[in-house]
Design a protein with these regions (language model features):
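PLP-dependent amino-acid enzyme catalytic core
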Residues: 1-403
Length: 403
C-alpha cells in the first residue's frame, strides 16, 4: 500500500543518490499557454533521468539474500541506468534486458555502471518477457520498471520535492509509459493536497493507459509506434492501475510532431536536452485547457543519442518553416541558375541544398527542374521568398524536404 510515511521514508533514502532538482520557471511556456509554468528537470539527474529514485529505493527494501542473487530488469533505457547505478551502489550484480531499438547512448551508459546488457525484442514488452525467463532460469531478483509499489514509491518522491518548493502548485503533468511515475506522483500529490489536478501524458502511438482508462481495466495495445522510446509500452502495470485510476484526473495524448517542436522549444529557450518521452509534458501544455494556473511539467529524462537529436532538430526546423524546399522549372541554358540565386539573395533566402534535374520533361531544352532547400526565419519569410520567385515569373511549388 502506498502511504505518506513510506513516501517520506523513500524521500530520505533517495537523497543518497539523487539531486533535488530545482524547479525552473519558464517565461516562454508561460507566455505560450497563459499559465505559470514550472519545469521539474529530472534530465539533470546523474543518470539522466528520474528512474534511479525508484530503483534505489526498491533495492533498499530487498533482503541481503535477494540482493546477493543478483538483480535483473527490462527497460527501454532509463530504468536500466537507474538499476545499474543503484546496483553498483549496493555492490550487486545487475543484468539488464533492453529492446534492440534502444538508443546507443542508453545502452553504453548502462554498461558503464557495470551492468550486463542483453539486447532482445523490438519493444519493452518483449524484453520484459525475456527478463522474466532469465530471472527464473538463473535465480535473479526481478526489479520491475513500473509495476511495483516500492518502485512507484521511489518515483513519487518527485512530488514531495515539487510541494516543498511550490506548495501552491495546482496542476502536475506526468509522463506515462507503464505508469510507475504516474502512480507514485499522483498518489503522493493527492495525499498532500486532495484538490490538486494530476494529468498523465502519453504518446498517441502508445496510449496503453488511456485505453485502459476507457475500458476500466488493464488493456494491451496490439502495437506501439512513437518516437518516445522510453514510453513505448503496450501494457500498463496491473498492480499499480488501481492507484492511477483513483488519483489521476485525466490523460492527454500528444503526437510525435508535437514532441519534435517541443524539443526545439527546450533547446532554443531553455538550452536543455530533453528526450522525447520527457517532452510529453511540455507538448501537452497547450492541450491543458486552463489559464492562470500554477503548472509543473515533469521532464523525466534527457538521455538522447546524437543521431536521434540531429534528426529531431532537422524535423523541428521543417515544421517551424525554418527549412523548406521549393521546386521551380526553368530553361536549360546558361545564366538561369544565377538568376534564381540572385532572386533568393535579394530576399535573404539562404540556400543549403540544390538539386538540378534535366529529365523532368522529355524536352529538357524546354524546362529542367531545380529543387532548392532553403533556410529562412519562419513562415512570414518563407512566404516572402515564394512571392519573390513568383514576381520573377517562376511557378514555385513546395515539395517535401529531404535532408
Amino acid at each position: 500500500m502506498l502511504t505518506l510515511d513510506k513516501f517520506e521514508e523513500a524521500s530520505e533514502k533517495v537523497k543518497e543518490v539523487t539531486l533535488e532538482t530545482k524547479l525552473i520557471y519558464s517565461d516562454f511556456l508561460s507566455d505560450q499557454t497563459g499559465n505559470k509554468v514550472y519545469l521539474k528537470p529530472e534530465n539533470m539527474q546523474f543518470t539522466g533521468a528520474y528512474k534511479v529514485r525508484g530503483a534505489y529505493y526498491k533495492i533498499s527494501t530487498l533482503t541481503d539474500e535477494e540482493r546477493a542473487k543478483g538483480l535483473i530488469t527490462a527497460s527501454a533505457g532509463n530504468h536500466a541506468q537507474g538499476v545499474a547505478y543503484a546496483a553498483k551502489c549496493y555492490g550487486c550484480k545487475a543484468v539488464i534486458v533492453m529492446p534492440t531499438t534502444t538508443p546507443l547512448i542508453k545502452v553504453n551508459r548502462t554498461k558503464s555502471y557495470g551492468a550486463e546488457v542483453v539486447l532482445y525484442g523490438d519493444v519493452y514488452d518483449e524484453a520484459c518477457a525475456k527478463a522474466y525467463e532469465l530471472a527464473e532460469k538463473e535465480g535473479y531478483t526481478f526489479i520491475h520498471p513500473f509495476d511495483d509499489l516500492a518502485v512507484a514509491t521511489g518515483q513519487g518522491t518527485i512530488a514531495m520535492e515539487i510541494f516543498k518548493e511550490l506548495p501552491l502548485v495546482e496542476y502536475i503533468l506526468v509522463p506515462i509509459g507503464g505508469g510507475g511515475l504516474a502512480t507514485g506522483g499522483s498518489t503522493l500529490a493527492k495525499l498532500l493536497n486532495p484538490k490538486i489536478k494530476v494529468i498523465g501524458v502519453e504518446p498517441a502511438g502508445a496510449n496503453c493507459m488511456q485505453e485502459s482508462f476507457k475500458n476500466g481495466k488493464v488493456t494491451t495495445l496490439p502495437s506501439v509506434n512513437t518516437i518516445a522510446d522510453g514510453t513505448a509500452v503496450k501494457t500498463p502495470g496491473s498492480n499499480i492501475f488501481p492507484y492511477i485510476k483513483k488519483n489521476l484526473d485525466d490523460i492527454i495524448t500528444v503526437e510525435d510532431d508535437e514532441l519534435i517542436v517541443a524539443f526545439l522549444d527546450m533547446v532554443e529557450n531553455h538550452k536543455m536536452i530533453v528526450e522525447n518521452s520527457g517532452l510529453l509534458t511540455v507538448a501537452a501544455l497547450k492541450h491543458l485547457g486552463v489559464k492562470d494556473k500554477r503548472v509543473v511539467s515533469i521532464l523525466s529524462g534527457g538521455n538522447m543519442d546524437v543521431i536521434t537529436m540531429s534528426s529531431v532538430v532537422q524535423q523541428g526546423l521543417i515544421f517551424r518553416d525554418r527549412i523548406f524546399t521549393v521546386s521551380v522549372l526553368l530553361p536549360d541554358k546558361p545564366g538561369e541558375l544565377a538568376k534564381v540565386s540572385q532572386t533568393l539573395a535579394d530576399v535573404q533566402g539562404n540556400v543549403i541544398k540544390l538539386e538540378h534535374n534535366q529529365f523532368v520533361t522529355t524536352n529538357r531544352s524546354a524546362a529542367v527542374e531545380l529543387r532548392i532547400t532553403l533556410e529562412c526565419f519562419g513562415t512570414e519569410h518563407k512566404e516572402q521568398i515564394i512571392a519573390a520567385l513568383e514576381k520573377k515569373g517562376y511557378k514555385p511549388r513546395i515539395v517535401r524536404t529531404m535532408i
